[in-house]
Regions:
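Histidine-centered active-site microenvironments of extracellular/periplasmic hydrolases
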Residues: 62, 296-329
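Bacterial N-terminal signal peptides
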Residues: 9-21
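Active-site-proximal N-terminal segment of extracellular/periplasmic enzymes that hydrolyze or transfer
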Residues: 28-104
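Non-catalytic, well-ordered alpha-helical segments in soluble enzyme domains
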Residues: 154, 158-161, 339-372
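Metal-dependent active-site segment of extracytoplasmic phospho-/sulfohydrolases and closely related
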Residues: 39-40, 48, 270-311, 352
């Protein structure tokens, strides 16, 4: 009996030890890479009014001194339609005719879908920080071009999936984007408003677009032309096949601050076309087709009235209201969200990670959860 009991105890201890070792190895092992890709596109300071309703009837009727519309007849002919649905389809046809039927569009409060920022600043850097870290960061209170010690979803994805520095990328038209993208210099490929692309990573096309980007005059020193930034991003994507990429576009905010509502509308149509081309490019490449999610959002809203629509800060109602659009093979085709749980800007980070097979809680315990119902259930 003692011999059998001793053998039993020895086997039991050995089994427990094996189980503990296996659990420890499992806990230490990196998550399985599901091979999915995520592309984040941000359009700076785009209001819910235009995104969901096209040309705003309030601003369409406002005096030129408030709207900045240079030729009301021309602008109305381009963008005015009788219904909000017709106006938004004319303004952003890819979003409303391609993305919305196959994906999710959130933020139309008239239909019971609310997306808001949680930071208390309501301008750019705090918004991008909230998007990329999953939470409002109390110490981010300016647009100063500095890095903060908050790990971003881009850094976490690279580390967790053991991606190379070229497989995570940020390309944008404002220098603030490259600072918001990472807590550390050189964590992955980052390109600001006029940064030259290193020769080892560049192509003749990238060199051409970057040279033009240096020459074209912009409204603000810290920004560059969105079309050229987009072209650099597309060429980088074709050459290096990043798994995670953030493309930051900013001229929507530039034209709004210049109080040129007509040019804001023209720009949104242009940006929609660029995003459509991006999606078509992704579908033409084996590495991306059927395995890529596109997420589009904005950093803040703007004022709601003719007097304050051009501006944004914590004292202007409406600047907290934003939107999110998602398209991809893992996203259910919910369309324009109706009677939907409230969503915040910080939900974007964990939403990106869920498509990559990662858990936002491991990234940042204080991060917001993913957008509800944004992942297909098998």
């Amino acid at each position: 009996m003692r011999t059998l009991r001793g053998r039993f105890l020895a086997l039991l201890v050995a089994g427990l030890a094996t189980g503990i070792a296996a659990n420890a190895a499992s806990a230490e092992a990196p998550p399985a890479d599901n091979g999915h890709n995520v592309i984040l596109v941000t359009l700076d300071g785009v209001r819910v009014q235009e995104f969901f309703g096209g040309m705003d009837p309030v601003l369409a009727k406002a005096p030129e001194a408030q709207s900045g519309i240079y030729d009301a007849e021309v602008t109305s002919k381009r963008w005015w339609r009788e219904t909000p649905e017709a106006r938004r389809e004319a303004l952003m046809p890819f979003v409303w005719k391609t993305l919305a039927p196959a994906g999710i569009v959130l933020g139309n409060q008239a239909k019971g879908s609310k997306v808001t920022v949680r930071n208390d600043q309501w301008f750019s850097y705090p918004g991008y920080s909230e998007i990329l870290t999953g939470q409002a960061q109390p110490d981010v209170k300016s647009n100063d071009l500095v890095r903060y010690p908050h790990r971003t979803v881009l850094e976490y994805a690279r580390d967790s999936l053991a991606l190379s520095p070229t497989q995570v990328a940020q390309v944008g038209s404002w220098d603030g984007f490259k600072y918001a993208a990472s807590s550390k210099d050189g964590a992955f490929f980052m390109s600001g408003a006029r940064d030259p692309v290193p020769a080892a990573l560049s192509t003749p096309e990238i060199d051409l677009y970057n040279g033009l980007r240096q020459q074209i005059q912009q409204l603000w020193e810290e920004s560059s032309n969105d079309v050229l930034s987009y072209r650099i991003g597309i060429e980088y994507l074709k050459k290096h096949r990043p798994r995670v990429m953030w493309l930051g576009l900013g001229q929507s905010d530039d034209w709004a601050h210049a109080r040129r509502y007509d040019l804001v509308l023209d720009y949104l149509h242009l940006a929609d076309g660029l995003i459509a081309e991006l999606w078509q490019t992704l579908q033409s490449m084996d590495e991306y087709r059927g395995r890529t999610t596109l997420i589009i959002t904005t950093d803040h809203g703007r004022g709601r009235t003719p007097a304050d629509w051009a501006e944004h800060d914590a004292g202007i109602p409406g600047c907290q209201d934003i939107w999110i659009a998602i398209l991809g093979p893992k996203t259910p085709a919910l369309g324009e969200a109706h009677d939907f749980p409230d969503v915040t800007q910080g939900d974007v980070a964990a939403t990106m990670l869920q498509y990559l097979g990662l858990d936002g809680r491991d990234f940042n315990a204080k991060a917001r959860p993913p957008v509800p119902r944004s992942l297909k259930t098998e």
